[in-house]
Curated annotation (Swiss-Prot):
SUPFAM superfamilies hit by this protein: Cytochrome P450
Protein name as catalogued: Cytochrome P450 11B2, mitochondrial
Family to which the UniProt record says this protein belongs: Belongs to the cytochrome P450 family.
Keyword Membrane: yes
Pathways involved: Steroid biosynthesis
Annotated binding of heme, by residue: 450
Gene: CYP11B2
């Protein structure tokens, strides 16, 4: 991946095995007590123009996570990174995440994701909270939280997700039992994607799409393809100034806009259905998140559309890939899988009667999801544009600096997680109440944590609960799966898994 062996630390990244990358630690010496100036901070080696040329030539930045992990080893837990924009600092320790939260203002600021914003400006669409900053962000966020993120909201949409998870398990069981051996080996990734679309669509818009156990519609397949193109083109464009990329990558911009057109059309159709139904009669029971937002009318219709679009686009890949990697890790760690199965079976009757109890009666399964996201953080980094000066690792960080927290390296720090290469959900139960609040931050922190976090957690928890009750999950593959960065961190290949029915 590197252009020069000395200038770019990513020279070995494409061939660096995940097993080796997991075991890398931080060899940084203890920082001196005197606060050092920003300019004294170690800097990521290499020429930024060569790096941009490399991204353009390779049509992406697939090994970003390995490159940055290697750089942390060589430079320590903090360094500067120059991509031509504002001052940028990379960190990977929980203590720095905590300091970032402590200095959060009323309007915690993120960098503008230019390709996404450019599309919305060009098409005349509003931005949702993922893309907003300042007072408008806070106004929207405070009115979205009660119906999307609050415990009360979770209690309302969780039974809807549970119904889809049950259907997924039953559809899979039907396929397995059609085989005389009582087992089925398949690439389950497409089915998981259909599940996440179905569950999210039901929770958001109150409508079943018939994707689970049935052949997907052309509209759903087009939506999935559009998401893939959108994420890939985002990486190809996000590291370059628009003034440059519009000239050297016009085809990518065209693909990016066409993908968003498809995504917006999909989401807009869903919202229009709800809007028309509400115009005729007020529902007597809960019919989903978007209906509640429309009924309350605390946000404009355009703002509800904008935020619904972000939730729709952000609720598929980001949930499906952690689910796939959890199933893979449980398949190659059968002892862990059996313990989780026992927990699910013990709680089955209670959860069947009250699906909401899944959030409290499956602590080890919740820990398994934390362990998956430690090893495979679907969002590679968190970011803040700090509003005031602060000190990180004894270096002065001026206001206006972009600070990025790299979760891939945080999760593989042996000083924080002994034997970090080992898949061990129990470690999360062992550290509960130990004050390590910032060891698990895959959904962000503070007021800017992921708005769809609780929906994603419910979808993952319930699917795994129902699958573990009915199937042994096996794999012949013991080797690590190569992960690639494509705006989200995803497996480069999908593992074949065997589902064996439990009598």
């Amino acid at each position: 991946m590197a252009l020069r062996a000395k200038a770019e630390v990513c020279v070995a990244a494409p061939w660096l095995s995940l097993q080796r990358a997991r075991a890398l630690g931080t060899r940084a010496a203890r920082a001196p007590r005197t606060v050092l100036p920003f300019e004294a901070m170690p800097q990521h080696p290499g020429n930024r123009w060569l790096r941009l040329l490399q991204i353009w030539r390779e049509q992406g930045y697939e090994h970003l996570h390995l490159e940055m992990h290697q750089t942390f080893q060589e430079l320590g837990p903090i360094f500067r990174y120059n991509l031509g924009g504002p001052r940028m600092v990379c960190v990977m320790l929980p203590e720095d995440v905590e300091k970032l939260q402590q200095v959060d203002s009323l309007h915690p600021c993120r960098m503008i994701l230019e390709p996404w914003v450019a599309y919305r400006q060009h098409r005349g669409h509003k931005c949702g909270v993922f893309l907003l900053n300042g007072p408008e962000w806070r106004f929207n966020r405070l009115r979205l939280n009660p119906d999307v993120l609050s415990p009360k909201a979770v209690q309302r949409f969780l039974p809807m997700v549970d119904a889809v998870a049950r259907d997924f398990s039953q559809a899979l069981k039907k396929k397995v039992l059609q085989n005389a051996r009582g087992s089925l080996t398949l690439d389950v990734q497409p089915s998981i994607f259909h599940y996440t679309i179905e569950a999210s669509n039901l929770a958001l818009f109150g409508e079943r799409l018939g994707l689970v156990g049935h052949s997907p519609s052309s509209a759903s397949l087009n939506f999935l393809h559009a998401l893939e193109v959108m994420f890939k083109s985002t990486v190809q464009l996000m590291f370059m100034p628009r003034s440059l990329s519009r000239w050297i990558s016009p085809k990518v911009w065209k693909e990016h806009f066409e993908a968003w057109d498809c995504i917006f059309q999909y989401g807009d159709n869903c919202i229009q259905k709800i809007y028309q139904e509400l115009a005729f009669n007020r529902p007597q029971h809960y019919t989903g998140i978007v209906a509640e937002l429309l009924l309350k009318a605390e946000l404009s219709l355009e703002a509800i559309k904008a935020n619904s679009m972000e939730l729709t686009a952000g609720s598929v890949d980001t949930t499906a890939f952690p689910l796939l990697m959890t199933l893979f890790e449980l398949a190659r760690n059968p002892d862990v899988q059996q313990i989780l199965r026992q927990e699910s079976l013990a709680a089955a009757a209670s959860i069947s009667e009250h699906p909401q109890k899944a959030t409290t009666e499956l602590p080890l399964l919740r820990a398994a999801l934390k362990e998956t996201l430690r090893l495979y953080p679907v969002g590679l980094f968190l970011e803040r544009v700090v509003s005031s000066d602060l000190v990180l690792q004894n270096y002065h960080i001026p206001a206006g600096t972009l600070v990025q927290v790299f979760l891939y390296s945080l999760g593989r720090n042996a000083a924080l997680f002994p034997r970090p290469e080992r898949y061990n959900p129990q470690r999360w139960l062992d550290i509960r109440g130990s004050g390590r609040n910032f060891h698990h931050v895959p959904f962000g922190f503070g007021m800017r944590q992921c708005l769809g976090r609780r929906l994603a957690e419910a979808e993952m928890l319930l699917l795994l609960h129902h699958v573990l009750k009915h199937f042994l999950v096996e794999t012949l593959t013991q080797e690590d799966i190569k992960m690639v960065y494509s705006f989200i961190l995803r497996p480069g290949t999908s593992p074949l898994l065997t589902f064996r029915a439990i009598n």
